[in-house]
Amino acid sequence: MKNFLLQFLAFSTLSLLGMGCSTTAQLSPPTSASLSASPRIQQLTEKERLRWSHLDPIHDTVPGMSVDRAYTEVVKKRKGSPVVVAIIDSGIDLAHEDLKDLLWKNPGEIAGDGLDNDQNGYIDDVHGYNFLGESYHEQMEFVRIVSKKLGDFNLQQKASAHLEPKLTEAKTAVLQYQQIEQLVRMAHQNIQKKLGKESYKLEDLEKYEPQSVEEEQVLGLLTQVMAMGQDIPSALADLQEGIHYYQSQLEYNLNLGFDGRKPVGDNPYDIKDLGYGNGNASHQLEEESHGTHVAGILAANRSTKKGVKGVAENVKLMALRTVPDGDEYDKDIALAIRYAVDQGAKVINASFGKKFSPNASWVQDALRYAAAKDVLFVHAAGNDGLDLDLPENSNYPNDAYSLSGTPSENNYLSVGALTPSYGPDMIASFSNYGKKGVDLFAPGDEIYSTLPNSNYGVEGGTSMAAPAVAGMAAMIRSLYPQLTAVQVKRIILDSGLSVPMKVRVGEQELALSELCGSGKIANLYTALLLAEQVATGK
């Protein structure tokens, strides 16, 4: 029993809770030489932790984007022109207190009349469009490839090889989480009886003298859990969430017999089968919070004193619901990109991605269309902790569509994630990387933003880093509308800050220049200064 507990504790410590502008000459922009070569030692305050992504690397020794400094010293009272930003995601809470006044409105559509008033092929698309209709749960793409025999034999073999370990992992995880949950629950109930009270603190456990080996094991288990900073009821809730997560994978995401597309009613493998979905671009369930969190990072209302402030102002948010609880369909993404472009979006945020893409050419064609129409596409690099430059670590969509041999000259920008820890651990352990596959890094871990039903909370992922950079792009395009998408991308990359220390990726310590194309971290303050220079020629 003791050996099992030791194995459990080793496992649980990792996974239990894991689930009028001044001229540039008058300003002193941060430079690579300005950044500290030493990591930050002191802990962030609670206030700093909730808004670390807006703090300044020099003044605060945090790898934030200097958003506060940019507004204070550069933007000041300047008002740019409105910029439409499309959020291709899981839908946005259109009634959220920090987002409802920022929604893009289709001028040619009449809400709720059931007609396609502007004849664009989409009925009641007032604030965007819902390409998923009433669907929510969905298979992963490699599961669809196997179950529907998509693509050639080679693709099917690769997908099958990817599926088997995922199934094993999910089945094993369900059993492990159930065993852990049962152990913690029994230990919790036993110690409640021994102490004679429902709730207790870590100090109570430390004072208690165990009367047997079993009690010693119980104390050790509960002490380790509580030493991680949570009370036992919260830990049990997290364990139950883990059980639900992996059970859901087995029931839906990895289930060869599940058909999540049935409620939509279209053929997802026929790009010409149109007219599906509906005009309700909001989230459908409370747990469908991803798109709302992304939208808040990018553009939560800066003129109120409510929950959060977004990176950008003067933004009109276009909601395009295409990302289910599972992998998105290439058809939906391609059509959503074209919709965004045709309806006037100048920036598209894409906080999604997948390893397999049987109809990648549809998305690539849409990205070329966006490039031709001067639209910047900002994509999350992915959360697998992989080197995207290795051929086996594919991530879609990517910039393979580009006709230019120079990545800096296309309209695709890939963003990796930073943690709030300035120092060797500033690259998020989950973030993908690669000199070719990732352009730069931005804040993406422990990010506080909007959640459905006018709530707020912390989430992490490259999904959170992408909208931070998309917000930068929106600000530049708002203040300097004469700049092209390619120029905006180049400004964001060139104005980033180099970090004078090596950072950890797995077991390695590497320079940031080895992990992304620019070798830099995103910074709004320096980006606006450079945009001013490029726009004015000064």
Task: Label each residue range with its predicted role.
Residues 25, 341-343, 347-350, 410-414, ...:
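C-terminal subdomain of the subtilisin-like protease fold in secreted/lumenal serine endopeptidases
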Residues 17-20:
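C-terminal motif of bacterial Sec signal peptides marking the signal peptidase cleavage site
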Residues 41-51, 57, 157-185, 189-192, ...:
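Short acidic, glycine-rich surface-loop motifs adjacent to enzyme active sites
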